[in-house]
Amino acid sequence: LTGLRLSTTAPEIYYALAEATAFATKAILDHLAANGVAIERLTGIGGISQKSPFVMQLLADVTGREISVIDCKQACAMGSVVYATVIAGCYGSVEEAQRALCNFPARRYTPRDERHPLLMQRYERYKAQGGLPQR
């Protein structure tokens, strides 16, 4: 955290942590893209993606990408079920099993263009301050 003052409030600290997490995600996506790994879509599963619309919207705004969130309380178990049904021959592919068994997506978060320029200024400052060291 930078700029911390005695008057800094808990919501301001929470926002700073959420923003730093979103910036780190963007840094990872940028690094992958620069090295030839194209990420076609972002999908939120469990935890924060289901509990915090605020964080998910911030992530969409920072990355400039739409994020789909699935509505599944036991995503890991459902993933096992999907693969097991394909291996057992119930479905011909993972995609077919997903279409049949999963509720996808429950919500979508679309980037808000009006927020992007300000967030990109803050992202550049984050990188300049040494966010997500690259080694």
Describe the role of every protein-language-model region.
Residues 1-135:
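Glycine/Thr-rich phosphate-binding loops that ligate phosphate moieties of nucleotide
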